[in-house]
Amino acid sequence: MSKMAIDIASSCSNRFLEGYTAILPPEQEDKLREIVGDWEKIMRPRVEQPDELLELARNDSVALLIVGDPMQATTHIDLEARCNELDINFNIVPGITATSLAVSLSGLQSYRFGRQVTIPYSYGSYLPTSPLEMIYKNYENNLHSLILFDLDPTGMGIENPRPMAPSNAISLLEKMEGKLVEKGENISCKVSDFEGILLTDISLDTQKIRSGKMSEISKLNDGRIHCLVIAAKMNQNEAEAFERRKIV
């Protein structure tokens, strides 16, 4: 947190930690309490149906604490709109987001990234292929893909998040590949042959950054929270950075 964020959160009479679009490790939650004071964790329903928060904010100061970039989620943009409608003062304090850290720590050049992709948990027999289709589109345009892993197997945003493991994410990509092949789609590269960089527990003491083929990365399930970069054709500097991060 920036000094501004700490000062503002500490000064608010009411503090809520939003616990479903991103998460803090338990030890970081304890540290947050030490830094800004006590807070209450709230999940998706209370943020998407924010009448309680809005009523509180009419007459008192409220801090909604969000891990990373506070305005990356549509829910938070909608909350700003609701405050504007009700003439409730709304201020944004920028945070450091894992998505920007992932790009810089990957060793790949930021201007060569295409559209960001999220791999969702499959719900029953439903498995969309659009995430892999976007990865292929980026790849065919020689653009790298930053891939975020789902946190919520239920899709409801009510229970404590359960971060997706690399093996699960890559297995889902391979199932998407199978569905595309069944439909007769031409694929530019097998999922197992993609080269990528797994970023684990970014900014924590346990941070690890490792590169290799998807078949290698799928075996890396240590750590807690992961994201993945699938690389397109790399230039010399990128290729050297990739080699320095190789799985050993």
Where are these regions (language model features)?
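Class I S-adenosyl-L-methionine
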Residues: 1-89, 93
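Beta-strand/loop-alpha-helix module characteristic of Rossmann-like adenine-cofactor folds
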Residues: 90, 100-248
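Conserved active-site and cofactor/substrate-binding residues in soluble primary-metabolism enzymes
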Residues: 4, 27, 44, 48, ...
